[in-house]
Amino acid sequence: MARIAGINIPDQKHTVIALTAIFGIGKTRSQAICVAAGIAEHVKISELSEEQIEKLRDEVAKYVVEGDLRREVTLSIKRLMDLGTYRGLRHRRGLPVRGQRTKTNARTRKGPRKPIKK
């Protein structure tokens, strides 16, 4: 298995699909990385030479991925909560942030129903 950005990339998948195993890299970005590295998208990771894998590592290093991206997202949510914005309050209360209804639905965000104590 090739190791890129601290993640073991699946060997038996095509390059474009395998790169999406890295947090922060979707299909479009992985296609751009393959083009920049000069690697065909349909080639499997196991068929790449060490030199080509090194090119992929260099291209992936240009983006914010994995731990740095997770930290950035967490800090931006924390910043919203510290500022006391509406979005921050919704995050703090564990409610939907983007205007969805909450009278019914929103169970994923709110968690399981809490029984009413009598």
From Swiss-Prot:
Residues 92-118 are annotated as: Disordered. Gene3D superfamilies: 1.10.8.50, 30s ribosomal protein s13, domain 2. GO terms for molecular function: rRNA binding; structural constituent of ribosome; tRNA binding. GO terms for cellular component: cytosol; small ribosomal subunit. InterPro entries: Rbsml_uS13_C (IPR027437), Ribosomal_uS13 (IPR001892), Ribosomal_uS13-like_H2TH (IPR010979), Ribosomal_uS13_bac-type (IPR019980), Ribosomal_uS13_CS (IPR018269). One of its GO terms (biological process) is translation. Keywords: Ribonucleoprotein, Ribosomal protein, RNA-binding, rRNA-binding, tRNA-binding. Belongs to the universal ribosomal protein uS13 family. Located at the top of the head of the 30S subunit, it contacts several helices of the 16S rRNA. In the 70S ribosome it contacts the 23S rRNA (bridge B1a) and protein L5 of the 50S subunit (bridge B1b), connecting the 2 subunits; these bridges are implicated in subunit movement. Contacts the tRNAs in the A and P-sites. NCBIfam families: uS13_bact (TIGR03631). This is Small ribosomal subunit protein uS13. It comes from Yersinia pestis. The gene is rpsM.
